[in-house]
From Swiss-Prot:
Protein name (record): Hexamerin
Chief location category: secreted
Signal peptide feature range: 1-17
Organism: Blaberus discoidalis (Tropical cockroach)
Family: Belongs to the hemocyanin family.
Length: 733
């Protein structure tokens, strides 16, 4: 899925230096590809049930991992996994969280088994074996990450997670209706479609944003980010390099927060307060989700939202992930080198103990490092934050995320994840009630909880403190001599709500594969969309040159109607696009469509559609094409614009043209880098951009000295219309 490292380029006759964004990179799938694609899809059908495809079941049943130890790159990977498996891992049917230490450790062991399989045949037999023996949540996480990371699997398509495991994406009331319908239609003999509307009740202002928080595409983007950049991945162990990984962590979180801010802005809501370990938590949350075993995703009622991360009597607390039996004990050193769990995670207990005092200590250490100018490693080595800004923010981002490349996990912890863990267990801090993992403790649901954005605001404050110490960009650094933007023309910007059907067939059990063909259950959700728009940029240049075009959208007025100072609103500008272009001497008009954005991905093909097309192609009924330029990871194209207003809402459309500085001999070859802005460029590739992410809004600025001829600010108005109005206008056209 990572082959599609492509950068969307402007379509104009003058842009001959780069591939066209309309170029067709589709490839006709051969029999080998179709066989493997079909097998991947079948593996993911009703993953909480035993596999009812007999051939895959037999492959898994007959396979002996230990007897095939030489078919894996490293024998110790097999030994480590089997040692944990024989000792006892998370049982099937138990809710899973990749942020519980023990469960995360087990998932890494399983991923390593998949990742280090020497060839496809070994990989396939291993996943068939694991499909019915490993917890379904762990299996899905490890399998998906392996497909994203293995070079030999890069072209294969995974169905969207909201259709593999709908429980964490669709209202539990709808799931219940699907159960009841299935019970009344046990003996289906022909296909029958049922559509279950997802209804929302807005009980407080925060819930007005339900359509954004609960957008299945947005939450899929967040999950795919972690499949692209697994938290446990590190360069030393896996021998791969993630270019600007720490900076990308910062930028994606900053942009998510800014996009949520713009969505709040469209509802005249103010900015959220940052979370803090010793202050009351303000946001209640009722997820209306439940796991496949029937356990509810825990809510956070108002009375618990009002208390701080300290326990109500002022004492500290921990949370645990104990799930019974002997599964919670890990005493052996299953990692090699420094990657024993107690070393990597900083805790050596079978429970995950997190004290608010720990957060206070980690918080102080990060702030001290920013102020001092160094992050500290083992035993006495230190890495400078301000000598090379690109490396400095990378070090800082790795430290705050606490990923596998952090210079010192023991010393700095993982502030981002620790805050989510503590806030997520706020209702049941001692784990007395045995609650399932909360929304904040799962990659598929974290963005649904508004609390995540309180945490993001706090996380962003570290980076803003760091950026505040960097020198402001000077006029000479910002200007592009000989290049001027003379005008920007933006088409009409219109948002609307439409309807989207999520295939929820996988929530109901069937006995044989044939029965599954007749089950067609769909949850119909309301989602935000916008009409595609085009903008034209008129550039005048003294000579032909390669340029980089950067496009942002930001608020012009605050929620009280007061015009922002540019420096005050720079944090809220969201990136709409970033692309190279070759301008000619004299005047060049750059035309760009919103669907070409390097930020976004488009709707994913549904599970049902993929199954039908692949099976038909496998049987010779039609051809199946896969797109080598498609990444399937990116911000949803539908959400590129914040919701408008009936009478319109004014925003600032900002364009900047900078010199294009080639970073790698393979920049933009052979494809475009689709959705690289928010999903990176994957392992062992360089970002095709020499500027900091978010440039030029990433540093403090003086409004009077900021504007240069190669920039252009344009007031635009975003309107919101009813779906019927959009349809009527389309028919008239």
């Amino acid at each position: 899925m990572k082959t599609a490292l492509v950068l969307i380029l402007a379509t104009a006759t003058l842009a001959v230096a780069y591939p066209s964004s309309t170029q067709d990179y589709r490839v006709v799938a051969d029999k080998t590809f179709l066989t493997r694609q079909r097998d991947f899809l079948r593996l993911l059908v009703r993953i909480e049930q035993p596999n009812y495809y007999a051939d895959q079941y037999e492959v898994g049943n007959a396979y002996d991992i230990e007897a095939n130890i030489n078919n894996y790159k490293y024998p110790h990977v097999v030994k480590n996994f089997l040692s944990a498996y024989k000792r006892g891992m998370l049982p099937r049917g138990v809710p899973y969280s990749p942020y519980y230490t023990t469960q995360s450790y087990e998932t890494k062991l399983l991923f390593d088994l998949f990742y280090y399989a020497n060839d496809y045949d070994t990989f396939y037999k291993t996943v068939c074996w694991a499909r019915d023996r490993i917890n379904e949540g762990q299996f899905l996480y490890a399998f998906s990450t392996a497909v994203f990371q293995r070079e030999d699997l890069s072209d294969y398509i995974l169905p969207p997670p909201y259709e593999i495991y709908p429980y964490l994406f669709v209202d539990s009331e709808v799931i219940q209706k699907a159960y009841e319908t299935r019970m009344s239609d046990v003996h289906l003999t022909a296909p029958k479609t049922y559509i279950f509307p997802v209804n929302y009740t807005v009980a407080n202002p925060e819930q007005e944003l339900y359509y954004w928080y609960e957008d299945v595409g947005l939450n899929t983007y967040y999950a795919y980010y972690y499949f692209n950049y697994p938290t446990f991945f590190n360069e030393t162990e896996y021998g791969v390099h993630f270019d600007r990984r720490g900076e990308l962590f910062y930028y994606t979180r900053q942009q998510l927060y800014a996009r949520q801010f713009l969505e709040r802005h469209s509802h005249d809501l103010g900015e959220v307060e940052p979370v803090h370990y010793d202050r009351p938590f303000q946001t209640e949350y009722y997820p209306r989700l439940r796991y496949s075993n029937g356990q509810e995703v825990p809510p956070r009622p108002y009375e618990y939202s009002r208390r701080s991360l300290y326990y109500s009597n002022g004492n500290s607390y921990y949370y645990g992930n104990y799930y019974g039996g002997n599964n919670n004990y890990y005493t052996g050193n299953y990692y090699t080198g420094n990657y024993h769990p107690s070393y990597y995670y900083g805790y050596s207990t079978e429970h995950d103990y997190y004290y608010p005092e720990d957060l206070q200590i980690y918080d102080r250490r990060v702030l001290d490092s920013i102020d001092y100018g160094y992050v500290f490693s083992y035993p006495d080595h230190k890495y400078p934050l301000y000598e090379d800004y690109t490396k400095g923010i990378d070090y800082l981002g790795d430290v705050i995320e606490g990923n596998g490349d952090t210079v010192n996990r023991r010393y700095y912890g993982s502030i981002y994840h620790f805050y989510r863990q503590l806030a997520g267990k706020n209702v049941d801090p001692y784990n007395d009630s045995g609650f399932a993992p909360s929304a904040l403790q799962n990659i598929y649901t974290a963005l649904r909880d508004p609390a995540n954005f309180h945490i993001l605001k706090h996380i962003n404050s570290y980076f803003q403190r760091y950026k505040g110490y960097l020198p402001r960009y000077t006029y000479d650094e910002l200007v592009f001599p000989g290049v001027k933007i003379e005008n920007v023309d933006v088409g009409k910007l219109v948002t609307y709500f439409d309807y989207f059907d999520v295939d929820i067939d996988n929530v109901v059990n069937v006995k044989v594969a044939e029965d599954g063909k007749y089950v067609d259950y769909r949850a119909r959700q309301t989602r935000l969309n916008h009409k595609p728009f085009t903008y034209n940029i008129e550039v005048n240049s003294e000579q032909a040159t390669d340029v980089y075009v950067r496009v942002f959208l930001g608020p012009k007025y605050d929620y009280l109607g007061r015009e922002y100072d540019l420096n005050d609103r720079r944090h809220y500008f969201v990136e709409l696009d970033r692309f190279p272009y070759k301008v000619q001497a004299g005047k060049t008009t750059i035309t760009r469509n919103s669907r070409e954005s390097s930020v976004v991905s488009h709707d994913y093909p549904s599970f049902r559609t993929l199954l039908r097309k692949v099976f038909d192609a496998y049987e010779g009924k039609e051809q199946f094409y896969y797109d080598k330029s498609e990444r399937y990871c990116g911000y949803p194209e539908r959400l590129l614009l914040p919701k408008g207003k009936t009478g319109g809402q004014t925003y600032t459309f900002y364009v900047m043209v900078t010199p294009y500085v080639k970073q790698d001999d393979h920049d933009f070859e052979p494809y475009n880098y689709k959705s690289f802005s928010y999903c990176g460029v994957g392992a062992n590739h360089k970002f095709p951009d020499d500027k900091p992410f978010g440039y030029p809004f990433d540093r403090v600025l003086y409004s009077q000295e900021f504007v240069t001829p190669n920039m252009y600010f344009k007031d635009v108005v975003i309107y919101h219309k009813k779906y019927e109005e959009i349809n009527a206008a389309t028919v008239q056209q």
